[in-house]
Amino acid sequence: MNDRISEVSGSSRARRSVLSYGTTETGSDRYTENSNIATENGVDTASSMIDGIQSGFPQPRHGFEEEYNNAEYINMLEQVFYMYYTDKRHRGVISKKNAEPTETIHDWRMRERLKTVSAALLVCLNIGVDPPDVIKPNPAAKYECWIDPFSLPASKALEAIGKNLQQQYETLSMRTRYRHYLDPAIEEVKKLCIGQRRNAKEERILFHYNGHGVPMPTASGEIWVFNKNYTQYIPVSLYDLQSWLGAPCIYVYDCSAAGNIIVNFNRFAEQRDKEALRIAKQNPNVLAMPSHTSCIQLAACGPKETLPMNPDLPADLFTSCLTSPIEISVRWYVLQNPFPNKLNLNMLLKIPGRLQDRRTPLGELNWIFTAITDTIAWNVFPKHLFRRLFRQDLMVAALFRNFLLAERIMLVHSCHPQSSPELPPTHDHPMWNSWDLAIDNCLSQLPDMLDAESKGIAYEYKHSTFFSEQLTAFEVWLSQGLISRKPPDQLPLVLQVLLSQVHRLRALILLSKFLDLGVWAVDLALSIGIFPYVLKLLQSPAIELKPVLVFIWARILAVDDSCQADLLKDNGYGYFVQILNPNSSIFPSSNISEHRAMCAFILSVFCRGFPQGQLACLNPQVLSHCLSHLNSPDSLLRQWACLCISQLWENYSEAKWSGTRDNAHVKLAEIIVDSVPEVRASVLTAFTTFLGFPEKTEEVVAVETYIAIAALAALSDASPLVRHELVIFLSHFVVNYKKQLMVVAYESSLADILEKKNHNSISASTIYETVWQAVLVLAADPSIEISLAAEAIINYVYQSMLNSELRESFLAFLLQHLPALHKASLSKDTDTNSVTSDPKPHPFVPSVSENKILNRSFSLTRSLKGLALSLAGSDRASELLSLNGENKPAESNLNHLTSAKVPGPPAFNELEYQSELDMPLTSYLFDWSRKYFTEPQMRPNEDDEPGSICYNQRLWRRNRNEKLIYRTRPLAEYSTNGRWNQQLMTFNNTIAPRKLMFHQFEDQLITLGDKDIIQVWDWRRNRCLNSFKTSASATTNVTDMQLLNEDDVALLMTGSSDGTIKLYRDYENEKVELVTSWNSLSDLVFGDRNASLLMSWQQNCGHLLVAGDVRVIRIWDASKEICYANLPVRSSNSITSLTSDLVGCNIIVAGFSDGVLRVYDKRLPARDSLTDVWKEHSSEIVNVEMQSSGMRELISASSDGEVKLWDIRMNHSLQTFSTDNSGLTSLTVHSHAPVYATGSSNQSIKIWDTLGQNINTFRENPRFLNQPKPSSLMCLKFHPHHLLLACGDNTDSRVNLYSCTKNEIHTDSPNEF
């Protein structure tokens, strides 16, 4: 049992199997160490390095061989490989559309729940007199309600039959009021029916008709009763019957030719409904009458059929099936059984026990019968019909369960029971075999049970294994690989098993596994009726049920939050409050933190938009419990503790005051720098809901100011998810302090327009000034959804300003400076080559970069100009603009720009998103986060299952990668004596390249050209795969690019001169998408297109090193999306080149503009990270590069043509070579071969080995004799594995590809690669 508990109470996060992606604390994906296809580590496998060392090759430099001989270190590198930027938060913008559930559930609650409150039981037997149209054989069926009518006097027999009929119906529903009318006259029938409708009001009436003693119904459907003297049969028109009984009703017809009644009843019902509709149209004030076509009817046989007269069966076989299914089932089973046994028909009515007691033989049979008929109906009937007939009314459900039995039994006797609504056939369903087996198990013990009972001896009854076997079948279905969305046959049985304490835990565990399959599974479970069961179980004190019940409730509330009132009733929510309590120890699961996270989620849904829920959660200290979990090691618990607090605070001042007393805002501020982006975003959501006290007392202002200051720490966050929540928080802060922000915006706008360097204002250095400047920073955010949201805040403030007392002065000022505004706008719209050389600083606090404000100055100016044009009047505005002759559209000056597309986030519609930007902005983080509980957590994703398409693709890529490395590794020794001037092909790039890069394993060459155009080439087929523009900005340019996750599906990372980092998915095709973006170096000088941002990506540890014209090397942690460290460069010169150890990821080497090389170790504290300074170069460092495998050579080159080899353990270079290049412009080093290449401004390319020997010299673009040789900046790049070299320069758009050829090794065909 404990094993079963742990099975469910295990991690609610994704459990990954072999090859699967796992989820780390920080959210990045990884291949697990058990993976059979664990991929390459970064650029090369550690095993290949070890093989090289053990094969007698020279030892790697820098002392790395010590690490390679460490088995634990090598295992770590080979067995764990992380994938970055593949989490759910990187799959799209969190907008209203994206936060909506991808699947919806049906309305599983019965909104129009009817009850059968009254029943009229008409029995027309006329015992002793056969009707004229019936010829009975001898012997014939005679039992009515299990009574022989000829064993008693006629009057007593009739009375006994009526009494038994009522008792049989009472086993179906005790709450229904029954009246039986025996051999009634027509007057009595009329009076009975009218009285029944009057008493039932609008509820359902049961009308049971036994016509065994009267003629068959007429062709028009009339049924027969008696006159007062019992001398005549009197017909009753169905039209009259409908008038007397009204609707809704359920009719049971037990007579021959009963199908005629249904046919004619429906015909009259349609006529009545049409007439009612006509009257309603003529007089809308008339109350609508219930529809007669919705009445339910059950008939014993078809229109031309006669009831069976088998003497071994009761005469009212149909009634027996409907009201005493167990008795008739066992009798029919014995009659159908050809084998000899000890049973006789009299024994069958003596099965011990009670129907309501499941522990007795009779009760167990009844329980099994209910489960089987429910299962058959669920699997055969349409779902809407199942809900109407089996979940709306106890009486209707019981009758239809038993009707399935009637169909099975009576078909054998040439009767076809009819119903309205018509049902699909179920007589041959396989589950009937299980019913026969259950009967056989009981009857096989019946003689011994009766014998023991007669002797007064206790008998140990062997219970049926039906339910345990069905649970096993359900478990097998769940354990299969690909889960079909076809519901399992056993699902209704699971609900029945919940009634049993013996099987309850197992059933709950299996149910939780089923719900884990997704929204569709929860929808099925709710529609079948799971909710009342799990709601009632919240009252159970059983400790072993707590983990699984928490999981089930989390799944239900993740898709349907309409259960709040249900949880409030009977204190159901207290079940989860008790588990959430950190001092609670009554929990059997070892991973209680994850179940507490689910409890926090459940309570957050309970509070959301439900004031009664908020009030209920305030008293049992839910807030205190959540605060105590903010420092939990489980990130999911931290996240949902914050979100639960946010929902408790939403529009509930008392809860906010309670949080203030508990220092909730201080505790939340402490985790604003949490390692998980979702947690940081959740903190900001909680801050947002805290704002909005109705009264702004000093204490309230102080607390909200504290929160605003704490929230601004997220301004430099690398996760768009966090920054998006920040801009939402700021929108609420702006709305709450609108007057103060209007003053700040007014003064800031004047300063911006007048370009005042020192603008004194009453709001300077206040929190409102800081907030306003933060909004301006966010308006320049590289993520479009954030910048649009920030612009909405700016527009809101300006519109509020123009609707306030500042309107006149501000409008007059705008009109006065409108021409200047328009000129500034045009100049910034059209100037694509330069920006203002002396940008005016914006008044700002030290905590926010001024350059970010300047980056947004154009948008601010444009906004002000737009406001002025719209408010000042078109005539005056046109006049002012015409004075300057600048009313031509700005787009005419942009024709020279390329029309290449700029990728955005996946499925992002800017217009649709802007329509959602109402102030204050709405956060959809909660809805987005709750989707976690709709995704499978107990089993790997389908893509990670062996045999799936994605699995096979990943396996193929792994094999391809290993094969490529295995095939290219031996070529390294031939690289130093081959011919490198063999030109394989030329790529006709559309624009001159500035940087080149090969994919390690795909046949891709990526070029970065002017105007930030990136082109992706298939170098084997000389085909351009895709071309796109990384930015529409004319003031920055992309200066570096890297590839991430190359072993699987790579992402392309670009870095711009303004510090912006962008990542792209599917960059090789037209569906390229922006994954994420952020500003990595906010201190870079804005507008300096010569500024360079340099990057070094360390795949093994997920660190991105960023440097440029700043005084630090900033290290970003990709998994946490935060700044890991800032290493001081200890130099006033700019960094011109950056490299690092891509295996151990600890050593960083930077080259500077003054020729100095500096070595850093990021394992050391930041202030002590500088370990070596090499000053041997006398001119600017062009490039410094460390091999990722092979000898791990570290090579640097300066612009004067000097190349040096280094070992980080030495304080001087190992070797120095002079390339004799006049104006060396580029250096590239092969990843594992002992060669490097240099390029000069005269387009001369030289290939060298690491001993300083020149292998080849050739020119990139040969010219004719008298043609001048322009100076150019060359770009070179080796393929990481193949012996290929790509070359380009900034005077020609062509890119040439060269290979190292040697007759013994290669042919001249590129297919060799």
UniProtKB/Swiss-Prot annotation:
WD repeats lie at residues 986-1029, 1033-1074, 1087-1126, 1130-1170, 1176-1216, 1219-1259, 1268-1308. GO terms for biological process: cellular response to amino acid stimulus; cellular response to starvation; meiotic cell cycle; positive regulation of cell growth; positive regulation of conjugation with cellular fusion; regulation of autophagy; sporulation resulting in formation of a cellular spore; TOR signaling. Pfam families: Raptor_N, WD40. The keyword Cytoplasm applies. Residues 1-35 are annotated as: Disordered. Component of TORC1, which regulates multiple cellular processes to control cell growth in response to environmental signals. Tor2 is essential for growth. Nutrient limitation and environmental stress signals cause inactivation of TORC1. Active TORC1 positively controls cell growth and ribosome biogenesis by regulating ribosomal protein gene expression. TORC1 negatively controls G1 cell-cycle arrest, sexual development and amino acid uptake. This is Target of rapamycin complex 1 subunit mip1. The keyword Transmembrane helix does not apply. It comes from Schizosaccharomyces pombe (strain 972 / ATCC 24843). The target of rapamycin complex 1 (TORC1) is composed of at least mip1, pop3/wat1, tco89, toc1 and tor2. Belongs to the WD repeat RAPTOR family. PROSITE patterns: WD_REPEATS_1 (PS00678), WD_REPEATS_2 (PS50082), WD_REPEATS_REGION (PS50294). It comes from the Eukaryota. The modification Phosphoserine is found at S834, S837, S882. One of its GO terms (cellular component) is nucleolar chromatin. Keywords: Cytoplasm, Meiosis, Phosphoprotein, Repeat, Sporulation, WD repeat. GO terms for molecular function: protein-macromolecule adaptor activity. It is found in: Cytoplasm. PANTHER family: REGULATORY-ASSOCIATED PROTEIN OF MTOR.
